[in-house]
């Protein structure tokens, strides 16, 4: 079985990708920047695709409305494109180091007419060091815990059930005991719906989820336990009940009208959902409002960063502006995007985020462990190539399930597979997420795609807190797995060295340690020949010469004879 939650939508269809490529080739677009995230001391090379309807003659680098550098086109190359059955021009531009941190713009001209503008953040910002050691616990607030109690189940899962910040606070001991050091909370702002992704007020907490004092206390108590709090932030769209949108809707002459994208009486939305109008993030006032809101929760409450919802929605220039402004003031904060895209397109967000939720990795993990789509050789090769493609600077964040997908166990029907997939997830450099309840063995009652509908609420059921509803052995397994990862830097920042065999096998290595990862997903024993002496990080057993792996089993082996 190959299972697809359709998170990628049309991106998995070749016809869609070809059509998108055709549209892209009709406009000027930035194909590549080298280096990908330029520093002040770097010479920078830009590669643009230029269609036939344009002829780029010159350009400028601009900062704060001041011309910093002018250039003529240094290199032109003709390119044939089968997808449009026509030529286009590849333009390469090299500029000297810009020397100063700043938010720059590159302008391209045809004679005296500006025909293209792209923002570029030149800076020394990086993901904070604490992020590479992060193990993220993803909490869907409305379903997690209500004060010190369990959230009561309701047949109407589309209504707010009342999970709140006090509920998270009441479970901090549990989260700390798991070994978690970062919590990502779904949107807590005043909202029309139970999921919080349609915000009525970016500066207020929804009363059903708590108060600002509750948030301050949660951040303080969590930080005292070595746990950071990351919030879910939604810049692409807001609730139609937001007073800003209501004023724009009712008054065609309002300055707020330009904060949105009106077309006559209609307006652009989030995937056609009329209750979620899209924000025009090319409008300076709208941009400033969103940035100020994001800064507010960091400055006033000590938030450690944001998961940015629907990051492919806003124009990519917005992210250059947002990232530069936030990191300039709060360099130790962490920002990762919900970038549901191909790896090639995702990489264009380097320098605009610290990292991304890795949807490609999510898909191939589920396709392999549940769907048995790939051979072990193909799977290990894909992981190796993705590691090399992204490198370690742009942080990938891994997950086996989330609030928009079916639970892993709902699809796999096998806790052994969940354990094996989790061991793999915790053995690669991507920052791992545990979705609340995953560690307890939570599943669901109905498929989110039942009847060709999208029933996300069935992956968002209330979390069970009574002992008889939790798998204590599975919780203990996750606790041990978290401890192992945190104790061995090779697992979260080591070099990935593939070994092609009849099972998943690879080495994670730093100068200080080498760990051999072996995962057998077959229903038969496998033998692996060892080239040294190893200690199993789960059992403590010592192995030399060879190791017999039982069916559906895994070993994390620390080499001890160096």
UniProtKB/Swiss-Prot annotation:
What InterPro entries does the entry give?
Glyco_hydro_13_cat_dom, Glycoside_hydrolase_SF
What residues bind Ca(2+), as annotated? 236
Cellular-component GO terms for this entry? cytoplasm
Cite the entry's keywords alphabetically. Answer: Calcium, Carbohydrate metabolism, Cytoplasm, Glycosidase, Hydrolase, Metal-binding
As recorded in UniProt, its EC number(s) are 3.2.1.1
What is the enzyme's main class?
hydrolase
The active-site annotation reads 309 (nucleophile), 338 (proton donor)
Name the GO terms of the biological process aspect. carbohydrate metabolic process
**What SUPFAM superfamilies does this protein map onto?**
(Trans)glycosidases
Task: Return the annotated site residues (Transition state stabilizer).
Answer: 404
Q: What is its main location?
A: cytoplasm
Q: Which reaction does it catalyse?
A: Endohydrolysis of (1->4)-alpha-D-glucosidic linkages in polysaccharides containing three or more (1->4)-alpha-linked D-glucose units
Q: Name one GO molecular function term.
A: metal ion binding
Q: Which cofactor does it need?
A: Ca(2+)
Q: What remark does the entry make about the cofactor?
A: Binds 1 Ca(2+) ion per subunit.
Q: Where in the cell is it found?
A: Cytoplasm
Name the SMART domains for this protein.
Answer: Aamy
Q: Which residues form a coiled coil?
A: none
Q: Which domain of life is it from?
A: Bacteria
The miscellaneous annotation reads: When compared to AmyA, AmyB produced larger amounts of reducing sugar.
Similarity remark:
Belongs to the glycosyl hydrolase 13 family.
Assembly notes:
Monomer.
Q: What is this protein called?
A: Alpha-amylase 2
Source organism of this protein record: Dictyoglomus thermophilum (strain ATCC 35947 / DSM 3960 / H-6-12)
């Amino acid at each position: 079985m190959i299972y697809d939650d359709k998170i990628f939508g049309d991106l998995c269809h070749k016809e869609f990708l070809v059509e998108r490529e055709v549209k892209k080739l009709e406009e000027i677009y930035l194909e590549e920047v080298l280096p990908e995230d330029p520093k002040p001391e770097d010479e920078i090379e830009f590669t643009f695709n230029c269609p036939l309807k344009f002829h780029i003659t010159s350009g400028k680098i601009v900062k704060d409305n001041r011309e910093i550098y002018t250039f003529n086109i240094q290199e032109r190359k003709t390119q044939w494109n089968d997808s449009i059955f026509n030529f286009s021009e590849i333009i390469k531009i090299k500029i000297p180091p810009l020397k100063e941190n700043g938010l720059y713009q590159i302008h391209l001209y045809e004679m005296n007419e500006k025909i293209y503008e792209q923002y570029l953040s030149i800076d020394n910002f990086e993901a904070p060091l604490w992020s590479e050691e992060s193990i993220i616990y993803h909490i869907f607030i409305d379903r997690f815990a209500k004060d010190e109690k369990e959230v009561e189940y309701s047949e109407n899962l589309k209504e707010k059930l009342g999970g709140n910040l006090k509920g998270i606070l009441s479970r901090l001991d549990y989260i700390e005991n798991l070994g978690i050091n970062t919590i990502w909370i779904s949107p807590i702002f005043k909202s029309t719906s139970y999921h919080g992704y349609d915000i009525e007020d970016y500066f207020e907490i929804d009363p059903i989820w708590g108060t600002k004092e509750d948030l301050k206390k949660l951040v303080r108590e969590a930080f005292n336990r070595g746990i950071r709090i990351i919030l879910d932030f939604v810049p692409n769209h807001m609730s139609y009940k937001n007073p800003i949108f209501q004023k724009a809707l009712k008054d065609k002459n309002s300055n707020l009208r330009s904060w949105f994208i009106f077309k006559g009486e209609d307006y652009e939305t989030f995937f056609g959902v009329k209750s979620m109008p899209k924000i025009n993030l090319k409008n300076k006032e709208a941009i400033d409002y969103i940035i100020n809101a994001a800064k507010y929760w960091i400055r006033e409450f000590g938030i450690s960063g944001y998961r940015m919802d629907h990051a492919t929605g806003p124009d990519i220039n917005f992210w250059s502006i947002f990232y530069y402004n936030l990191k300039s003031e709060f360099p130790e904060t962490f920002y990762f995007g919900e970038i549901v895209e191909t790896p090639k397109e995702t990489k264009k967000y380097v320098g605009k985020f610290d990292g991304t939720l890795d949807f490609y990795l999510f898909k191939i993990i589920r396709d392999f462990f549940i769907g048995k789509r790939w051979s072990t050789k193909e799977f290990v090769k894909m992981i190796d190539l993705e590691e090399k493609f992204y490198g370690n600077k742009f942080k990938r964040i891994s997950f086996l399930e989330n609030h928009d997908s079916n639970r892993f166990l709902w699809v796999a029907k096998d806790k052994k597979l969940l354990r094996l997939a989790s061991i793999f997830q915790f053995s690669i450099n991507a920052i791992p997420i545990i979705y609340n309840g995953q560690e307890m063995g939570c599943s669901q009652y109905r498929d989110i795609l039942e009847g060709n509908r999208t029933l996300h609420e069935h992956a968002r059921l209330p979390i069970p807190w009574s002992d008889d509803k939790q798998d204590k052995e599975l919780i203990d397994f996750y606790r041990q797995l978290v401890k192992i990862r945190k104790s061995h830097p090779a697992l979260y920042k080591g070099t990935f060295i593939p070994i092609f065999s009849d099972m998943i096998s690879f080495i994670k290595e730093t100068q200080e340690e080498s760990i051999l990862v072996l995962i057998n997903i077959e229903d038969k024993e496998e033998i692996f020949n060892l080239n040294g002496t190893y200690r199993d990080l789960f059992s403590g057993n010592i192995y030399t010469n060879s190791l017999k792996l039982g069916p559906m089993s895994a070993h994390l082996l620390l080499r001890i004879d160096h």
